[in-house]
Amino acid sequence: MIETPSAAIISDLLAKEVDFFSIGTNDLTGYTMAVDRGNAAVSKLYDPIQPAVLRLIETTIKNAKKAGIPVGMCGEAAADTRLIPLLCKWGLDEFSVTPSSILHTRKSICECE
């Protein structure tokens, strides 16, 4: 599970030791941006579209691809239609989303193809 910035940064090394990656975007975003999404005073800063978060996600996906292992994503970002085109472009293999997000996520993925 890639949930911390440090794990994403060394994902090239971790990829040699595991069979797959799952990127946990809720924690990855929170730890990267140093915000608690449940804290109203700072929750507006919680956004997986921030460049630092995007770079960590892209790095992790690219390192998984180089190592020949599948990579999936869970958390709110997996269903974020602003992010799905990038995830498709980078080669994300699996999107794990809530049941209420399946249809719009599937539609967004189909629009990428």
Which sequence ranges carry the predicted segments?
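Conserved alpha/beta-domain cores
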Residues: M1-E113
